[in-house]
Amino acid sequence: MNAAIDDVLALVRPDLQAFAGYSSARSAAAQGEVWLNANESAWANPADAAGSSRRYPEPQPLALREGLAALYGVTPQQLLIGRGSDEAIDLLVRALCVPGRDGVLVTPPVFGMYAVCARLQGAALIEVPLVDSEDGLRADLDAVIDTARARNAKLVFLCAPSNPAGSDIALDEVERVAVALRGQALVVVDEAYVEYAQRPSATTLLVAHANLAVLRTLSKAHALAAARIGTLIAAPELIAVLRRCQAPYPVPTPCAELAVQALQPAALARTAERVTTVIAERERLRAALAGLPGVCRVYASSGNYLLVRFSDAQAAFDTLLAAGVVVRDQRAAPQLGDALRISIGSPEENDRVLAALSARRAAA
């Protein structure tokens, strides 16, 4: 084991470094024809026509691991599959942060689950706000590095592209943060929306930087939000530790089977086509919104959404709702007291957004 891996494993809570975890019946490498080791029913439920649900699922389904590894350009040993990225975030915080001692650094306004998991674990929440400029709401990475060092951050979450801001972080900047915090913190890049950013993934940096981890999901571009297939990609040694901290059966069989089908070439080709459509619609909607009265600013976005500031965000929200369009009210988030986040829908759905907002201004 090399020094870089040793440094990362040293970030794991001391009481969990030798933790064996729960050994489920399915994790045993036994072979046989009659399976009587897990107290499962010998008969399928009448509602289960295929009879596949009476057995516990594989803890980390092999076909899905191999498919995700191929999709993300990594090895299966670098993957941990969980119930959405939320589970991976929670596992990281619980496995690395000692309550009352360690901290989790976030860059608000940002995805809220980082803060939720930190607070549930009793870890200090360290905030380095995004900076609003002509280039958008962007992470101040110098401040991230300095604050992480000064305040004992064990985990640093970089949301790239950022939700809800839409700004991205260049890979050389991600690498700079990882180098600066080597031996002190694990830098976690949340790439839930990276398919829309049209850049290489931070997974390309993992070989050189053991204190880097990447979150990916099938919920967004791959349109499988209900299946809850999230993936943490990191050094195999760290993945092994986190697997011991994970619940024994995190991936239901129907979800795994659906995800494997979604990773077949034909499905991936259709997904790529839809990503192209979303990017084109994002830019069309951005330009059209920017020309509407009452719209103060539409931020450039590398995700499948737009952050929009309004002169009267409540009126805009109510107008859209009256037209049957539900968007995300961001006004409770730091720095976003006048903002809504609008997901990029189909061309017809985006036209409804524009029609509703245009009609409101015409009637005013």
From Swiss-Prot:
The EC number(s) given in the record are 2.6.1.9
This protein's cofactor list reads: pyridoxal 5'-phosphate
Q: Which pathway does the database say it acts in?
A: Amino-acid biosynthesis; L-histidine biosynthesis; L-histidine from 5-phospho-alpha-D-ribose 1-diphosphate: step 7/9
- One BP annotation, GO: L-histidine biosynthetic process
What Gene3D superfamilies does UniProt report for this protein, alphabetically? Aspartate Aminotransferase, domain 1, Type I PLP-dependent aspartate aminotransferase-like (Major domain)
Determine the domain of life of the protein's source.
Answer: Bacteria
- Keywords per UniProt: Amino-acid biosynthesis, Aminotransferase, Histidine biosynthesis, Pyridoxal phosphate, Transferase
Residue positions where N6-(pyridoxal phosphate)lysine is found in the record: K220
Q: Name one GO molecular function term.
A: histidinol-phosphate transaminase activity
Reaction catalysis annotation: L-histidinol phosphate + 2-oxoglutarate = 3-(imidazol-4-yl)-2-oxopropyl phosphate + L-glutamate
Q: How does it assemble?
A: Homodimer.
UniProt lists the family membership as follows:
Belongs to the class-II pyridoxal-phosphate-dependent aminotransferase family. Histidinol-phosphate aminotransferase subfamily.
| Record protein name field | Histidinol-phosphate aminotransferase
Organism source for this protein?
A: Stenotrophomonas maltophilia (strain K279a)
Tell me the classification of the organism that encodes this protein: Bacteria, Pseudomonadati, Pseudomonadota, Gammaproteobacteria, Lysobacterales
